[in-house]
Regions:
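Bacterial N-terminal signal peptides
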Residues: 10-18
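Short, low-complexity disordered leader/linker segments with a strong preference
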Residues: 6, 20-23
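Secreted/extracellular ectodomain signature
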Residues: 22-151
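Bacterial N-terminal signal peptides that target proteins for export
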Residues: 1-9
Length: 151
């Protein structure tokens, strides 16, 4: 009887240990999720048609691959920074696409130049990220395997 009880306890302990180990592996796998596809879209034009096209490109590629299978980041610098300011003609669309897991990044150097020239810092749409150098961000993303698109 004692031998049987010992075997049951050992089996139970082994089961608990394996369940904990499996749970940790599953958790680690989801933490490091990497989408099948990655794209960075450059916007360096002040033209509202270019802004609309960049957003359409992002939406279309996300629809094609599926929201869970692609990472999309739009990086704006130079004259293209106007796309990500509160005065942009696409402000509402940019805000709604953030909900759809599209990332927007503004160039800090461009913002500093605008502030120096106008005396006012541009006001970005809420949720837009900022890096020091937009072009460097694009290079870094390409080095991480992102495909490059310029509408």
């Amino acid at each position: 009887m004692k031998a049987m009880l010992g075997s049951v306890l050992a089996l139970g302990l082994a089961l608990v240990v394996s369940m904990v180990a499996f749970a940790n592996v599953t958790e680690d796998e989801t933490d490091g999720f990497e989408p099948d596809h990655k794209v960075v879209i450059q916007v360096s034009s002040a033209d509202p048609k270019t802004h609309a096209l960049a957003l359409s490109n992002a939406v279309n590629i996300q629809k094609h691959y599926g929201i869970d299978n692609i990472a999309v980041e739009i990086v704006a610098y130079g004259p293209g920074l106007s796309m990500l300011t509160k005065q942009s003609s696409v402000t509402e669309r940019v805000s709604s696409l953030m909900i759809e897991e599209i990332t927007f990044t503004a160039c800090g150097n461009t913002m500093d130049t605008i502030a120096h020239n106008t005396g006012k810092q541009p006001v970005l749409i809420k949720g837009v990220g900022k890096v020091q150098t937009g072009l460097a961000r694009i290079i870094e993303l390409q080095e991480q395997g992102y495909s490059y698109v310029k509408p």
